[in-house]
Amino acid sequence: MAPVADTTPEVAHSARVVVITRDGCHLCNEALTIVETVCGQSGTEWLAVDVDADETLRSTYTDHVPVTFVDGREFSVWVLDADRLRAALT
């Protein structure tokens, strides 16, 4: 059996928490507020990335934003739970 290709975007490894987002997306704004609060409380590095700034991200995630990655792995799509994120960072 051939190995499965890693489809995780390179940007997901840019910080401990990465949120792929888009301007004008209300769910993105909610996710960013949660990430800013939870990461601020724990001192965790995080990064927001605009899905429309990169063709590869746009083609993969355009219908799924916000997408949150923790430690380089997809953690949530659309709705981010603050308690679940907090637990993942401890």
Predicted regions and their residues:
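Local sequence-structure signature of Cys/Sec-based thiol-disulfide redox active-site neighborhoods
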Residues: D6-T37
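Generic recognition of short, well-ordered alpha-helical segments
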Residues: E30-T33, T60-D63, L80
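Conserved helix-turn-beta segment immediately C-terminal to the redox Cys motif
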Residues: L32-V49
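A short, hydrophobic beta-strand/beta-hairpin element that forms part of a small beta-sheet core
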Residues: V65-E74
